[in-house]
Amino acid sequence: MATLMDKLITSVAPPSTKPNNKVTVVGVGQVGMACAISILEKGLCDELALVDVVEDKLKGEMMDLQHGSLFLNTHKIVADKDYSVTANSKVVVVTAGVRQQEGESRLDLVQRNVNVFKFIIPQVVKHSPDCIILVVSNPVDILTYVTWKLSGLPKHRVIGSGCNLDSARFRFLMAEKLGVHPTSCHGWILGEHGDSSVAVWSGVNVAGVSLQEMNPAMGSDQDPESWKQVHKQVVDSAYEVIKLKGYTNWAIGMSVADLLETILKNLCRVHPVSTMVKGMYGIENEVFLSLPCVLGSAGLTSVINQKLKDNEVAQLQNSATTLWNVQKDIKDLKS
């Protein structure tokens, strides 16, 4: 007896079972779900997979998103604790890990999260060997290095969200002072996503006008306008938000969706993201930190050779040393 579906639909050819732009988010905590909703709202993927170890929450988050399918352009949302659900992902976003506590440095998190990654990363690569991995968990620069080592993937397919958000905060805060929109205020935060980040004051501009040329003391202790405080606000902002609401999630979620849009649409936009910088700016160790990088469908394809002043290069090297001093003590990075 024919079913209602048989009566309604005449099949012409079997549908495709392999997704074109599948994205996986590992970890359905506050950050993971902010990433998920930001990705969905931008309509970046045709399939979204969620993975976590907490099954009830995972199923609940999946159902909640599925119930909004009418309002989305992503027709398939799936979830499971088994990583087979992630198969054929173009990009895997890793947000899982121990949450940063109030007053805790990102670098203090490292060894606790390494052990989590030793389970996650081999599973991701097993099911999506051609994927690009975007690491979001903190401390992001060190965990991007850990992911690179555990995954065996080439360095252009292991990217850390890095200073994409720091630079967004920097541009927002400067734009607030100048009374313009953040997109019209250009500036870069490089180095560690954290306390030793580097504000590139020499490159800050509005409409191509160098602000440091107009105020040579900009970013220094001698600056009468105290622009250096803007960078301090960037560094302190995550700690402040955590103190006020317990965690950060919305801005990093939007930042991740911004990166994914560039990758999945092959836009070749330049972002400050974490990459392997050995051999650049006099850095001799295998560390990951943020430089201006071109992203596209192949991953991180090139690095912009930004002209930095001597003091900025010194700060970048200090950032690399800060990361290496923690990284060199990480135990057993075999998957």
From Swiss-Prot:
Pfam families in UniProt: Ldh_1_C, Ldh_1_N
Catalyzed chemical reaction(s): (S)-lactate + NAD(+) = pyruvate + NADH + H(+)
SUPFAM superfamilies registered for this protein in UniProt: LDH C-terminal domain-like, NAD(P)-binding Rossmann-fold domains
GO terms assigned for molecular function: L-lactate dehydrogenase activity
GO annotation, biological process: lactate metabolic process
Binding site for NAD(+): 29-57, 99, 138
Main location: cytoplasm
Active site (record annotation): 193
Cellular component per GO, a single term: cytoplasm
Pathway(s) served: Fermentation; pyruvate fermentation to lactate; (S)-lactate from pyruvate: step 1/1
Keyword DNA-binding among record annotations: no
Keyword Lyase: no
Compartments where located: Cytoplasm
Binding site for substrate: 106, 138, 169, 248
Entry EC number(s): 1.1.1.27
Record key words, sorted: Cytoplasm, NAD, Oxidoreductase
UniProt-listed InterPro entries: L-lactate/malate_DH, L-lactate_DH, L-lactate_DH_AS, Lactate/malate_DH_C, Lactate/malate_DH_N, Lactate_DH/Glyco_Ohase_4_C, NAD(P)-bd_dom_sf
Coiled-coil annotated spans: none
Binding partners and assembly: Homotetramer.
Function: Interconverts simultaneously and stereospecifically pyruvate and lactate with concomitant interconversion of NADH and NAD(+).
Matches recorded under NCBIfam families: L-LDH-NAD (TIGR01771), PRK00066.1 (NF000824)
Family: Belongs to the LDH/MDH superfamily. LDH family.
PANTHER family linked: L-2-HYDROXYCARBOXYLATE DEHYDROGENASE (NAD(P)(+)), L-LACTATE DEHYDROGENASE B CHAIN
Name of the molecule in the record: L-lactate dehydrogenase B chain
Encoding gene per record: LDHB
